[in-house]
């Protein structure tokens, strides 16, 4: 599928996307996808990266990128952005700011590691996800990756 039809298909798939509280099983998802999708494809992993997910995701992405182009789209939590913008008036504010900064740095470090290994990545607020995904797809297509 190419061109506008591909963009429309991506948008239609994202329309009903809802977050859950269940932990993702990245290795299982990768195994199932590799068994079903034999031809090269663009695999978009929509997630909210957390410390406990990185090892499983690393293994899944490594397996997937052998056959497919991979785009990791991580939704950034708005509450962390809000915490980082609040003024610091005391110890509890300083601790909250430090925790937010540590969380951001870990995400950025992991996303940069993925990028260094040839994986396209997004780190975007949920409200921008659909537009950013379409733009990333178009950029990947223009670069011959999708």
Identify the meaning behind each predicted range.
Residues 1-146:
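Exposed, interaction-prone extracellular/peripheral surfaces
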């Amino acid at each position: 599928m190419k061109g506008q039809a591909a963009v429309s298909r991506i948008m239609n798939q994202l329309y009903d996307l809802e977050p859950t509280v269940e932990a993702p099983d990245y290795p299982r998802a990768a195994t199932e996808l590799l068994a079903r999708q034999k031809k090269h494809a663009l695999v978009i992993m929509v997630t909210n990266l957390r410390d406990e997910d990185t090892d499983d995701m690393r293994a899944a992405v490594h397996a997937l990128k052998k056959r497919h182009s991979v785009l990791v789209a991580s939704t950034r939590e708005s509450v962390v952005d809000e915490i980082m913008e609040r003024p610091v008036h005391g110890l509890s504010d300083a601790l909250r700011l430090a925790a937010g900064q540590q969380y951001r740095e870990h995400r950025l470090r992991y996303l940069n590691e993925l990028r260094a290994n040839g994986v396209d990545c997004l780190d975007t607020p949920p409200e921008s996800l659909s537009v950013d995904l379409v733009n990333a797809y178009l950029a990947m297509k223009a670069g011959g990756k999708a």
